[in-house]
């Protein structure tokens, strides 16, 4: 049995509260799905930015060095995906991916190494972003199930679900901006030098 409350009234029911339902759904989501959705949200956010500044192009979450072109046409920003976070040290996943992309394009050596800069996620902020994405996916799923008729909610619960879904999406947007905080760029004469 579950305890419910509304406007100072409390009662027991055999169905879980809306918040409990969302928390259960969020807890059941697979990590891989959450990471894919974070990369999608990152791409959507980056592509919505109109002003690219001094960057000729911005590439989001490439699957490998082969997806990053090697041309002289200006500075390219490579926004590393969620699989390559940075922890402020040389041995991070982000630094390994940056070195791989800087040294080669696919199987061929990269010629225009000095035209690339990288933006990477802060490893410490990533967990809070994952939690926010789980909540957003859970509330969106509740809304979808309500619209499809698979979930029968009261009108007050529908309004609450819409508010919670919007709030969760806003939290994801905020956390995306907070998480991608590292700028990594090549410098010096050596092939593998990079500065963060």
Predicted regions and their residues:
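Extended alpha-helical scaffold and adjacent linker segments that couple domains
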Residues: 1-196
């Amino acid at each position: 049995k579950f305890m419910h409350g509304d406007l100072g009234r409390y009662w027991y029911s055999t169905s879980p509260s809306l918040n409990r339902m969302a928390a259960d759904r969020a807890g059941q989501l697979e990590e891989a799905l959450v990471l894919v959705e974070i990369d999608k949200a990152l791409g959507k956010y980056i592509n919505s930015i109109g002003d690219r500044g001094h960057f000729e192009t911005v590439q989001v979450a490439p699957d490998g060095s082969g997806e990053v072109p090697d041309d002289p046409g200006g500075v390219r920003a490579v926004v590393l995906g969620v699989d390559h976070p940075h922890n402020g040290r040389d041995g991070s996943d982000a630094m390994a991916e940056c070195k791989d992309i800087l040294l080669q394009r696919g199987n061929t050596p990269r010629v225009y190494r000095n035209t690339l800069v990288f933006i990477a996620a802060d490893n410490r902020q990533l967990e809070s972003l994952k939690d926010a994405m789980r909540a957003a996916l859970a509330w969106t799923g509740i809304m979808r199930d309500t619209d499809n008729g698979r979930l029968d909610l009261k009108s007050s619960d529908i309004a609450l679900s819409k508010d919670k879904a919007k709030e969760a999406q806003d939290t994801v947007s905020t956390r995306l901006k907070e998480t991608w905080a590292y700028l990594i760029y090549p410098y010096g004469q050596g092939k593998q030098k990079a500065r963060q």
